[in-house]
């Protein structure tokens, strides 16, 4: 029996044709196709500047470098996140300060960051997990009052909105991912968006070892590294962008089925505010006996994925700081059910049927 993967992306013959076109036109490294992709993203998100980069993690690291974050600074991030924001801070020597998440949603509880702010606090990174918006209005008020930068981690939130517009466009810098399990994907890749020209100019230098171009370099003037994306990846990303509305519609359909059809009381749905424009890329549940559920589903050829650990579980980040750490319910019970831009409705209905029979 064919296995149902936890994620299934859609790649078509048209994607392959565009990749082939870029290849035969010798658009291999970063070039014209990438610049076209950047313009398309800026138009889509209604933002002035887009800088395409190697991946979403690089986007976060570059953003911190751009804003001058260093070992003398502290950066506030939520306990529930992929590890990338914390690792990016750690690489630069900045102290990671963990803020609580909301009680019933795995996103930053903005009201609880006030007592985390010190004279060393330089930035806050709200993480818009699974397309969910943090309270950006309150966060911006707090940041402005305390002269703190905001970097939105919108890796899982491309196309998601709140009442103020697209997530990732409501701060100093917004970081996005194009990895496989996203609403649009180029395999790997990412981008940074901003409305501030000086940040865009600096990010373009950081992307290529601190230089604007690699020919006729007279002097090394700025810090940077190789954070470039390729035209091959950008060609694929452009075609994926054209599928955005179709992908969004499909993901919303899957979300509605899981939300409405699962009746097992041991599977507690974690909601996404689709009425406000949030897009649920994944389908998340709190499962009382997660190990048992994973085992039963796997016996039925259904692959699920447990939530990743809390950031507070990363001992290497806090080795010099005492902390009282209690595992969150999201880390302990969270489970991703099969989804994806190419996940069939038949697969989803099978998952529902098995879950309701447990």
Where are these predicted regions, by residue range?
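Active-site phosphate-binding strand-loop segment of PLP-dependent enzymes
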Residues: 104-186, 191-193, 197-198
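Helix C-cap/helix->beta junction micro-motif
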Residues: 92, 145-146, 300
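Short beta-strand->loop structural element characteristic of the AMP-binding/adenylate-forming
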Residues: 95-105, 305
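N-terminal "arm"/small-domain region of PLP-dependent enzymes with the aminotransferase-like
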Residues: 1-27, 32, 338
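PLP-dependent aminotransferase class I/II
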Residues: 34-39, 47-51, 111, 123-127, ...
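Phosphate-binding glycine-rich loop
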Residues: 27-74, 88-92, 98-100
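Conserved coil-to-alpha-helix start sites within the AMP-binding
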Residues: 80-86
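Hydrophobic residues in well-ordered beta-strands that form the structural core
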Residues: 71, 77, 98, 150-152, ...
């Amino acid at each position: 029996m064919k296995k149902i993967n936890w994620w299934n992306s859609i790649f078509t013959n048209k994607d392959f044709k565009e990749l082939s076109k870029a290849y035969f036109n010798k658009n291999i490294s970063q070039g014209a196709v990438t610049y076209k992709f950047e313009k398309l993203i800026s138009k889509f998100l209604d933002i002035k500047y887009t800088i395409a980069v190697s991946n979403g993690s690089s986007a976060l690291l570059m953003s911190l470098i751009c804003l001058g974050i260093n070992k003398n600074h502290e950066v506030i991030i939520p306990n529930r996140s992929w590890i990338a924001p914390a690792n990016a801070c750690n690489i630069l020597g900045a102290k990671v300060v963990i803020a609580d998440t909301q009680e019933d949603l795995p996103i930053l509880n903005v009201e609880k960051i006030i007592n985390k702010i010190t004279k060393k606090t330089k930035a806050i990174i709200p993480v818009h997990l699974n397309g969910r918006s943090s309270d950006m209005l309150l966060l911006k008020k707090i940041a402005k009052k305390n002269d703190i930068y905001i970097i939105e981690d919108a890796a899982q939130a491309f196309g998601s909105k709140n009442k103020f517009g697209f997530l990732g466009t409501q701060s100093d810098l917004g970081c996005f991912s194009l990895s496989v399990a996203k609403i649009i994907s180029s395999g790997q890749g990412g981008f940074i968006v901003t409305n501030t020209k000086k940040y865009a100019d600096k990010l373009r230098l950081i992307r290529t070892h601190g230089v604007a171009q690699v020919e006729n370099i007279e002097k090394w003037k700025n810090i940077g590294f190789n954070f470039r994306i390729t035209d091959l990846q950008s060609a694929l990303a452009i075609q994926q962008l054209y599928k955005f509305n179709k992908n969004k519609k499909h993901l919303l359909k899957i979300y509605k089925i899981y939300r409405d059809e699962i009746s097992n009381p041991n599977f507690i749905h974690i909601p996404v505010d689709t009425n406000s424009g949030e897009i649920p890329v994944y389908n998340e549940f709190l499962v009382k006996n997660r190990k048992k559920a994973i085992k039963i589903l796997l016996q039925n050829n259904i692959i699920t994925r447990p939530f990743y650990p809390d950031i507070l579980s990363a001992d290497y980040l806090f080795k010099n700081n005492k902390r009282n750490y209690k595992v969150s319910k999201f880390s302990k019970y969270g489970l991703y059910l099969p989804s994806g831009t190419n996940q069939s409705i038949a697969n989803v209905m099978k998952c529902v049927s098995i879950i309701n029979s447990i």
